[in-house]
Amino acid sequence: MLLSAKFENIYSFNEETRILFTASKSDQLPLQVSRAEKRDDISVLRMGLIYGANASGKSNIIKCLAIIKEFALNGWSNLKYNYFKMTDEPQERSSIELEFKADNQFFAYGIAFSKGGLLEEWLYKTGSRNDTMIFERKRNGDSWDNTIAPQFLKNEDGQFLKFLIDGTPTKGTFLSEYIKRNGKGIDTIKSARKWFENLNIIFPNTHRTDFPFRVVNDTQFRTGCRSQLGMGNLFYVYWGR
């Protein structure tokens, strides 16, 4: 569940711009809000709709989501994008951060980057009262300053975690490297990474070959489609030769 997204110096976004899907305290439209049930929970909107004039930046929001997903899953791979250029002093440092809910936990994952590659990466566990760092990485010339929350370094996996984050390739992200190298000791990284794996981004030229199989095998997806489309049921029909 996406809670918010922040963009800075990328495409049509100059200064830090944030879009929120969290709910206000208003009770005028109660059916449109999923209210917090626990003290550290967050009330969110059941659905978000982005609208505006042509060329106002709507598509750029989706492009930014696709960029951070690519970073989270595969690291830097010579991604093509444009930083904000309609200024007298253009900067090359861009950043994207998403706040989301996964496995009943709230996270903030962000990256800062330039045309030359990744500059910063961070993952925090967030809540209604405070935020807790899981890890941070900052590029310092040709090296990296890496930090993992102390509680994860105390157990038997701590030494391997330090080795793993220090050995993350310059073009890689720790979020992806942790999974590739079978990292242990920080289950929250697995939850955050899984959220990005399940993040569906559909562009006009996207060919969704998995849709028929999800209709059959994913009960939650099928139920949601039926509810939104007003259909009695959905089936996968195979037309063989």
Q: Where are the language model's segments positioned?
A:
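Electropositive, glycine-dotted interaction segments
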Residues: 108-240
